[in-house]
């Protein structure tokens, strides 16, 4: 009886070590970016020229219920648009969401990631255009 048990135990150990485990590597998740329909935007679009010839486009959106206070902007940088919400700031205006932070100042503006990585710095407003939407 002891001989059979040890033989079965050894066989199970051998088969446990021999089996191939299919390990799948996790695929990197892509961030889903909210699509912004630029044709329907109302407000004022500013084009900022930044250091290293980077361009940032900022749309200060106006809606009927937000006419007095601008609560958000849409920032476009390198083909990606993000809707940023106004935050409290001592100097200038800060807009942010979970990914980006736009610091709007009188002299220079800056676009950063929320991890602190600078995407565009020393941005100066070049042109401004009115957007009427549809």
UniProtKB/Swiss-Prot annotation:
Lineage top rank: taxon: Bacteria
The protein's name: Opacity-associated protein OapB
InterPro entries tied to this protein: MliC_sf, OapB
Source organism: Haemophilus influenzae (strain ATCC 51907 / DSM 11121 / KW20 / Rd)
Gene: oapB
């Amino acid at each position: 009886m002891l001989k059979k048990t040890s033989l079965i135990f050894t066989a199970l150990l051998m088969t446990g070590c021999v089996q191939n485990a299919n390990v799948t590597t996790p695929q990197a998740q892509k961030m889903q970016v909210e699509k912004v329909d630029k044709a329907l935007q109302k407000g004022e679009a500013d084009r900022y020229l930044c250091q290293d010839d980077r361009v940032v486009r900022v749309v200060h959106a106006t809606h009927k219920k937000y006419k007095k206070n601008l609560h958000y902007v849409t920032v476009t940088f390198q083909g990606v648009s993000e809707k940023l919400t106004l935050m409290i700031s001592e100097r200038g205006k800060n807009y942010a969401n979970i990914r980006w932070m736009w610091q709007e100042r009188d002299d220079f503006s800056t676009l950063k990631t929320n991890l602190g990585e600078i995407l565009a710095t020393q941005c100066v407003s070049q042109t401004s255009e009115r957007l009427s939407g549809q």
